[in-house]
């Protein structure tokens, strides 16, 4: 009798183990939530985007936004193009 049961269990193992694993997983999941309880999230007054906007506003409050670096000054620090290496500089 045992060899017949073992042969049947071996043949139908995928059909037996999946429902058993599903039930064990579902019971464990529910049991874990029952033991832990609902998680308490801290209530935030502002969202992350609002905090970021507030921080950028505070940073720009002390600056004069009309004073910007000209494009000519920015271009001085960029490397010269490869094709302009052999050309003479204009004075």
Curated annotation (Swiss-Prot):
Q: Which UniProt keywords apply?
A: Membrane, Transmembrane, Transmembrane helix
What gene codes for this chain?
smim12-a
Q: Tell me what this protein is called.
A: Small integral membrane protein 12-A
Q: Where in the cell is it found?
A: Membrane
Topology in membrane: Single-pass membrane protein
Tell me which domain of life the UniProt entry assigns to the organism this sequence originates from: Eukaryota
Q: Which residue ranges traverse the bilayer?
A: 12-34
Pfam families to which the protein is assigned, alphabetical:
UPF0767
Q: Does the keyword Repeat apply?
A: no
UniProt similarity note: Belongs to the SMIM12 family.
Instruction: Please provide, in alphabetical order, the Gene Ontology terms of the cellular component aspect for this entry.
Output: membrane
Transmembrane helix as a keyword of this entry, yes or no, is yes
- Species this protein is from: Xenopus laevis (African clawed frog)
